[in-house]
From Swiss-Prot:
Gene3D superfamilies: alpha/beta hydrolase. This is Diacylglycerol acyltransferase/mycolyltransferase Ag85A. It comes from Mycobacterium leprae (strain TN). It holds the Pfam family Esterase. It is found in: Secreted, Cell wall; Cytoplasm. PANTHER family: DIACYLGLYCEROL ACYLTRANSFERASE_MYCOLYLTRANSFERASE AG85A, ENTEROCHELIN ESTERASE-RELATED.
Length: 330
């Protein structure tokens, strides 16, 4: 009888977990469009010295569009990385914020790679095949080798001592770039990212989101969930490296409660609550490992929305300038 009771309990527990996981998958599928496509119209005002570069990428076999604002000769760079539904015309940072205005004459060069939908700014194992066809995704190689070399040679921008800031999908991407390229990225900003992708349902949720966004497959990126690439690209697993590198971290995640800034819609509220747990988990690991070079902003408000990410980018500007040694007005 005890065996039967235990068996029934185990089955009931398994069913509960399956229901919860199914609800999570369904929820993410319904919500992931919250950072969806915006009009093909850049926000930056006329008169700002914004350039539209076509940077050769031998690794991806094509030129990559990059929006760029020069901060002066030998200035550090701020790489702004986009969300899951990154467009091919303009960066979401330019469409949805006044980032170029905020950082004009800051002494920091602003670099916005365009495109890379669902890429996680990673080097994929296989071609990225989606609804629009197939292409090669070698974004880590581009961001850490091809692009900085181009900017150094053509725009006199420092290839080291720079920052990577990403939102949503790119929150973990920015952290991963800093983990493996610490000389280039001494400062990293993560906003509302899912920071434990290898954990439990992480691979399934990411695969579902990528499929919904553009028909992409997570296995083409990092292989099956058992592949080491999932842990290799997990900031929470590798938090010790960030601590050892003494990387400066600025991390933000709201709790799903809107403020007067906006984002008062159900998808934005629920999705922010969904990713907050992984951010707190990262913070716990960072503190437990003795980390002491981070700013954690986890307010009792904020939704998965550009209004909050833009505010954070503006707020971190003095910290960025000081840490990168920028010379304002250059």
């Amino acid at each position: 009888m005890k065996f039967v009771d235990r068996f029934r309990g185990a089955v009931a527990g398994m069913l509960r977990r399956l229901v919860v996981e199914a609800m999570g998958v369904a929820l993410l599928s319904a919500l992931i469009g919250v950072v969806g496509s915006a009009p093909a119209e850049a926000f930056s005002r006329p008169g700002l010295p914004v350039e539209y570069l076509q940077v050769p990428s031998p690794s991806m076999g094509r030129d990559i569009k990059v929006q760029f604002q020069n901060g002066g000769a030998n200035s550090p760079a701020l790489y702004l990385l986009d969300g899951l539904r990154a467009q091919d015309d303009f960066s979401g940072w330019d469409i949805n914020t006044t980032a170029f205005e905020w950082y004009y004459q800051s002494g920091i060069s602003v670099v916005m790679p365009v495109g890379g939908q669902s890429s996680f700014y990673s080097d994929w194992y296989s071609p990225a095949c989606g609804k629009a066809g197939c292409q090669t995704y070698k974004w880590e190689t581009f961001l850490t080798s091809e692009l900085p070399q181009y900017l150094q040679s053509n725009k006199q921008i420092k290839p080291t001592g720079s920052a990577a800031v990403g939102l949503s999908m790119a929150g973990l991407s920015a952290l991963t770039l800093a983990i493996y390229h610490p000389d280039q990225f001494i400062y990293v900003g993560s906003m509302s990212g899912l920071l434990d992708p290898s954990n439990a349902m992480g691979p399934s949720l990411i695969g579902l989101a990528m499929g919904d966004a553009g028909g992409y497959k997570a296995a083409d990126m990092w292989g099956p969930s058992t592949d080491p690439a999932w842990k290799r690209n997990d900031p929470t697993v590798n938090v010790g490296t960030l601590i050892a590198n003494n990387t400066r971290i600025w991390m933000y995640c709201g709790n799903g409660k809107p403020t007067e800034l906006g984002g008062n819609n159900l998808p934005a509220k629920l999705l922010e609550g969904l990713v907050r747990t992984s951010n707190i988990k990262f913070q716990d690991g960072y503190n437990a490992g003795g980390g002491h070079n981070a700013v954690f902003n986890f307010p009792d408000s904020g939704t998965h929305s550009w209004e909050y990410w833009g505010e954070q980018l503006n707020d971190m500007k003095p910290d960025l300038q000081q840490y990168l040694g920028a010379t304002p007005g250059a």
